[in-house]
Amino acid sequence: MSDEKKGFWSRLVSGLSKTRDNIVSGIDSIFNGFSSIDDDFYEEIEEILIMGDIGVNATEAIIENLKEKVKENKIKDPAECKELLIHSIKEQMDVGETAYRFENEKSVVLIIGVNGVGKTTSVGKLAGKLKDQGKKVVLAAADTFRAAAGDQLLEWAKRANVEMIGGQEGADPAAVVYDAVAAAKARNADVLLCDTAGRLHNKKNLMEELKKINRILEREYPDAYRETLVVLDATTGQNALAQAREFSEVADITGIILTKMDGTAKGGIAVAIHSELGIPVKYIGVGETIEDLQKFDSNEFVNALFDVKQETKDSTEREE
């Protein structure tokens, strides 16, 4: 495991401590407190998972999966169920093999999210990560309605050493994307990252804006692979799920960036979003630096949640 990965892993483990207290300590008391596996046993686990923001749908699927495995393996001792439960949660969250296809093709990534969730910061961090992978990145500052969004993104562009187009407050976001596409094509960029607005309180305007941007991309950059990521604040729990649902009504969302995972008691929301909406969490953030945004890995996340020690082979397999 690289030093960067080790650092992220330890921050993730400590960052999920409140979520762990919220979920795991209660579950451990059930595993150790019950002498037999019965309906009450499953109901207690279900209650704790729902209280931990894992959500009703995900919890039901996890419990059903657990019941099947208990039956298959003829398990009688409740304490033996913990490993099966961990495995069931991991299965709910697998991002799939093509989740990061945009990294390997000429791509446009639209990033949307409401104010205050860490959207522009996430765009900057993602630019830095892609640049570190040797990709040629262009940023489009198309969130032109938020004061100083362009200035903030410019700081990140400088830090990541990538080019930024736009940034003028009040400009037409679609016009910024048009200019950025021209720049990306002229410079033969690998990835064009577009920081776009997320004014959910005015869904009609947002929908029109995204339609306009998408029309420009279809016309000007038809061969580019398209990705649309929504940035959500993990500390808002079920509110984050509601936002993801609303955004999916106005855009074809392909993934989630979940920020502020350090110090939230609501980390279980990562499971809920994936299960309820079928949208995978692709990145999680646990701090302020570029290294604090990492690809989501269900195995790592659930191990960190339950504080299961990482196996070395498990970690080295995923090193880039």
What positions do the PLM features span?
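Non-catalytic terminal/linker segments enriched in charged/polar, low-complexity residues
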Residues: 1-98, 104-111, 126-128, 132-139, ...
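P-loop/Walker A NTP-binding module and the surrounding RecA-like catalytic core of P-loop NTPases
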Residues: 90-93, 98-320
